[in-house]
Curated annotation (Swiss-Prot):
Keywords in alphabetical order: Capsid protein, Helical capsid protein, Ribonucleoprotein, Virion
Keyword Ribonucleoprotein in record: yes
Main localization, broad class: virion
Protein role: Required for genome encapsidation. Forms ribonucleoprotein complexes along with TGB1 helicase and viral RNA.
Pfam families: Flexi_CP
Residues covered by region (Disordered): 1-24
Molecular function terms, GO-annotated: structural molecule activity
Entry's Gene Ontology cellular component terms: helical viral capsid; ribonucleoprotein complex
Subcellular location: Virion
Family: Belongs to the potexvirus capsid protein family.
Transmembrane annotation, as ranges: none
Descriptive protein name: Coat protein
Superkingdom, taxonomy of origin: Viruses
Length: 237
């Protein structure tokens, strides 16, 4: 029986070897293997989309529903802005209860407008779409979100006290023609992120992850962790 051929290159040999890898680009690149050049990057147009923001298709569907509800077409945008401004005050979660009726919706309550939105996307995704509009509106009128103090925001960060604040700088949101009156400051961004983290932590503190209802395990508590314990166990900055 002959010995298997050696695949080891002799020591000192100057003969080059070529190694093929699974990720190598073919010599003749076409189709999905095409290599982009500078012209592509300078001329290509990207359509910005975010799964945190309502899409243009979503807005078209909501617009059709609102038309059926007899929301006037000529004030429909203002009705949307009013609703989102209201959400900056009361919140945009699925559990948020809308209050009263805005001045642009032909007597249709904000609750009904929000219910129609939820047939297409989440209320927060809708609010994220108009966050830059509401940001400018609040700054122009020096009117921060109503609950900024209750949420623990400092006065200098009060305009960031709404739960879709991240939409202000999201490129998929609708931007006013003049742009932002001013961009959010780093301190405002940090305050908004901190508030969101604390809110999530408190919500988790209300959940029950016990595997048993035995009092020896639950210690008579309904929730798994108290809010105080949750805050104490927050990771350091």
């Amino acid at each position: 029986m002959s010995a298997p051929a050696s695949t080891t290159q002799p020591i000192g040999s100057t003969t080059s070897t070529t190694t093929k890898t699974a990720g190598a680009t073919p010599a003749t690149a076409s189709g999905l293997f095409t290599i982009p050049d500078g012209d592509f990057f300078s001329t290509a147009r990207a359509i910005v989309a975010s799964n945190a923001v309502a899409t243009n298709e979503d807005l078209s569907k909501i617009e059709a529903i609102w038309k059926d509800m007899k929301v006037p077409t000529d004030t429909m945008a203002q009705a949307a802005w009013d609703l989102v401004r209201h959400c900056a005050d009361v919140g945009s979660s699925a559990q948020t209860e809308m209050i009263d009726t805005g001045p642009y919706s032909n007597g249709i309550s904000r609750a009904r407008l929000a219910a129609a939105i939820k047939e297409v996307c989440t209320l927060r995704q809708f609010c994220m779409k108009y966050a830059p509009v509401v940001w400018n509106w609040m700054l122009t009128n020096n009117s921060p979100p109503a609950n900024w103090q209750a949420q623990g925001f400092k006065p200098e960060h009060k305009f960031a006290a709404f739960d879709f604040f991240n939409g202000v700088t999201n490129p998929a949101a609708i931007m006013p023609k003049e742009g932002l009156i001013r961009p959010p400051s780093e301190a405002e961004m940090n305050a908004a992120q901190t508030a969101a983290f604390v809110k999530i932590t408190k919500a988790r503190a209300q959940s029950n992850d016990f595997a048993s209802l035995d009092a020896a395990v639950t210690r008579g508590r309904i929730t798994g962790t108290t809010t105080a314990e949750a805050v104490v166990t927050l990771p350091p900055p």
